[in-house]
Amino acid sequence: MTDRYILAVESSCDETSVAILKNESTLLSNVIASQVESHKRFGGVVPEVASRHHVEVITTCFEDALQEAGISASDLSAVAVTYGPGLVGALLVGLAAAKAFAWANHLPLIPVNHMAGHLMAAREQKPLVYPLIALLVSGGHTELVYVPEPGDYHIIGETRDDAVGEAYDKVGRVMGLTYPAGREIDQLAHKGQDTYHFPRAMITEDHLEFSFSGLKSAFINLHHNAKQKGNELILEDLCASFQAAVLDILLAKTKKALSRYPAKMLVVAGGVAANQGLRDRLAQEITHIEVVIPKLRLCGDNAGMIALAAAIEYDKQHFANMSLNAKPSLAFDQFPDSFVIN
């Protein structure tokens, strides 16, 4: 059997990444050019700055990924690219580069949903067992997804307002923490106690929707009022209390989803899946079903996860033509108009 190599491109936000996947789940390279330092002074991602950085480094990422993998363009079987959701300018840079590379090398083009990439990052660790439930938690998304078979995604619950990662960054900014704040809040939370009361929105309601705007507002109001009155707040306890509220919500909704759908596995993925507090709670409270969380290096945005998702689409011969365009608000159940089913 001839080995299959997929080159994947990811540029949906502030990471430029190119990866090479061998066959189903062996990552030969996963080059990531991070822009975090460029965005820190702004306290968040500036879309125009992100796009310019992508343009500056993407060619080098292609070269480095191929060199690290020890293959050439002639060895490749396909090119995969994130076409949404994400920042439209950032997406267009990766999309243009991937399309040009695929066209120049006569390779099929595989369109990949960014969130499907996060979910399928777990495939690098072990084969996924279907049907499964996925909890996807990142800076832009908080979703519960039912996956009856590979590549078939059904959103069964999502946030009505802020994503969980967005809430972390916003309260981190209020506390004067460095962007992105999730890791620092997690570390501080482990040193503190859950002493401040924060709301757990919709935690007892029967549906599978999330809401974090009320929690974020309650945190900001507490911090603001204490500052106005000259009251001292204990940073570690603030972080522990905020994180306890977040994790209570995530665990409650995930347990409800598992009780309603015939899942054989739970996948937890996305940037917030790197949170040690979340990992600890999952290990303690969900023991009746196997829980798979990608390795830390695959939790954030990276092209390796896009390649792992693309392998599923390659098996189905789901290719796109060169009219493929960026879809910044792409949903799980959307497919490109330019799909060519062979």
Swiss-Prot record:
Catalytic reaction annotation: L-threonylcarbamoyladenylate + adenosine(37) in tRNA = N(6)-L-threonylcarbamoyladenosine(37) in tRNA + AMP + H(+)
Disulfide bonds, paired cysteine numbers: none
Chief place of localization: cytoplasm
Gene3D superfamilies listed in its UniProt record: 3.30.420.40
Residues binding substrate: 136-140, 169, 182, 186, 275
UniProt GO cellular component terms: cytoplasm
Cofactors required: Fe(2+)
GO molecular function, one term: N(6)-L-threonylcarbamoyladenine synthase activity
Record's subcellular location: Cytoplasm
Keywords: Acyltransferase, Cytoplasm, Iron, Metal-binding, Transferase, tRNA processing
Record text on cofactor binding: Binds 1 Fe(2+) ion per subunit.
Coiled coil: none
UniProt-listed GO biological process terms: tRNA threonylcarbamoyladenosine modification
E.C. numbers: 2.3.1.234
Binding sites annotated in the UniProt record for Fe cation: 114, 118, 301
Family the entry assigns: Belongs to the KAE1 / TsaD family.
PANTHER family given in the database record: TRNA N6-ADENOSINE THREONYLCARBAMOYLTRANSFERASE, TRNA N6-ADENOSINE THREONYLCARBAMOYLTRANSFERASE, MITOCHONDRIAL
Role noted for this protein: Required for the formation of a threonylcarbamoyl group on adenosine at position 37 (t(6)A37) in tRNAs that read codons beginning with adenine. Is involved in the transfer of the threonylcarbamoyl moiety of threonylcarbamoyl-AMP (TC-AMP) to the N6 group of A37, together with TsaE and TsaB. TsaD likely plays a direct catalytic role in this reaction.
Protein name according to UniProt: tRNA N6-adenosine threonylcarbamoyltransferase
Source organism (scientific name): Streptococcus pyogenes serotype M4 (strain MGAS10750)
